[in-house]
Regions:
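Active-site loop-to-helix "anion-binding N-cap" substructures in soluble metabolic enzymes
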Residues: 1-383
Length: 383
């Protein structure tokens, strides 16, 4: 059963109790939310449902807790932060008190407004799509709304099993926008430029294969390009390589669409001495070298293609940007994409590290769409 559109069916949900699956998997340090992008992205759907007089049960996972009720993975800080963003009271259903679904349901039935369940991964069966947990979650509400794009491709009880129990099911407004934006990538205006980075070519090959015929150019950076260099018989020194991806790339070696870096920022490991950082052509890489960023000639090369684009999608950093010595390439390309978006080109950026890099430029607001789910974005685009 397909998820229905929320806007078109708002009369059917008015005044009802809604189970709203959101993605509040955000960084929390010392019980404080450190980055609230995902929370802010959820506000439109929450406010829409509140305007329709709905009682809302918010539900999300957070991290990978090893034991139920682990305070480190509690959503209590999220409840506090979200309440401020919404200027609304939120009843937080702490797992230590509310782990029994009869007690949870009684509390919800007696209350009104907004409720936030504690971490869904505290409940047995969330990650293995337990029908029993799905039934318990479905029993809390009259309507199901999925606004968690990042987990929409996963077989989780709060995404999949819950829908076995015949609740009317809708797409949240954020999920709707995610899909609309990604559909523009699947039906792009030309020239269409794909920028792919990261460490594992094996995780990116499905999307490269799916978009290959539509793409004008595919610009590759990060450690995933080392597979191509190895296949070409080039030395990659001590650079990271995804050995699982070596066989996959052979058919792309002679492609004129695939654009590889021509130089790199390199760390040379010297025994008993300080590591040396330098710019080298790919053909000059030595046995003790690690390629950790694209070089200046590559930045100019990539910029030339990006400036021609009418549609751009970017996933994955182009170097080890978390180190100041190796962030320049990723940051400059992020600026290029942001500068062209919301006007000359339609730009979509996705993936946790990619968004983090974009945020370092202070230009994220100019990008047409920043996806809340890197893995989900890749899954959707790769079909």
């Amino acid at each position: 059963m397909k998820l229905q559109d929320l806007h078109k069916n708002y009369k059917k949900i008015s005044g009802r109790t809604v189970f709203l699956r959101v993605d509040f998997n955000v960084p929390i340090i010392k019980s404080v939310v450190k980055e609230d992008f995902k929370l802010r992205q959820s506000l439109e759907t929450i406010n829409f449902l509140l305007s329709k007089k709905c009682k809302i049960i918010l539900a999300s996972h957070l991290g990978q807790p090893k034991k139920a009720g682990d305070k480190k993975y509690s959503l209590a800080p999220v409840a506090k932060h979200l309440a401020k963003l919404l200027a609304e009271d939120i009843t937080f259903l702490d797992y230590k008190k509310y782990s029994n679904f009869k007690i949870i349901k009684k509390k919800i039935d007696q209350g009104s407004g907004l409720f936030l369940l504690d971490n869904l991964r505290f409940f047995k069966g969330e990650e293995n799509n337990s029908k029993e947990l799905g039934k318990h979650l479905a029993s809390l509400a009259e309507v199901y709304v999925n606004d968690a794009f990042a987990v929409s491709h996963r077989a989780n009880a709060s995404v999949s099993a819950i829908r076995s129990f015949k609740l009317p099911a809708y797409k949240g407004l954020l999920l709707e926008e995610e899909l609309k934006s990604l559909d523009k990538i699947l039906n792009p205006k030309k020239p269409f430029v794909v920028v792919m980075g990261g460490s594992k070519i094996s995780t990116k090959i499905p999307i490269i294969e799916k978009l290959y015929d539509k793409a004008s150019y595919i610009l590759l950076g990060g450690a995933l390009v080392n597979n191509f260099y190895l296949a070409q018989g080039l030395n990659i020194g001590k650079s990271l390589v995804d050995r699982d991806g070596l066989k996959i790339i052979k058919k792309y070696l002679s492609s004129k669409k695939i654009i590889l870096p021509i130089d790199a920022i390199v760390k040379t490991i010297i025994k008993n001495k300080k590591d040396k950082i330098s710019i080298k052509k790919i053909s000059e890489i030595g046995s003790n070298d690690c390629m950790l960023d694209i070089g200046p000639a590559t930045i100019l090369l990539f910029s030339k293609y990006i400036k021609k684009a009418k549609t751009i999608v970017w996933n994955g950093p182009l170097g080890m940007f978390e180190d100041d010595n190796f962030k320049k390439g990723t940051i400059i390309i992020a600026r290029e994409i942001a500068a062209l978006s919301s006007g000359k080109s339609f730009g979509v950026v996705g993936g946790g590290e990619t968004v983090e890099a974009l945020n370092l430029t202070g230009m994220g607001k100019y990008v047409d769409w920043i996806s809340t789910g890197g893995g989900a974005m890749l899954a959707y685009l790769s079909g």
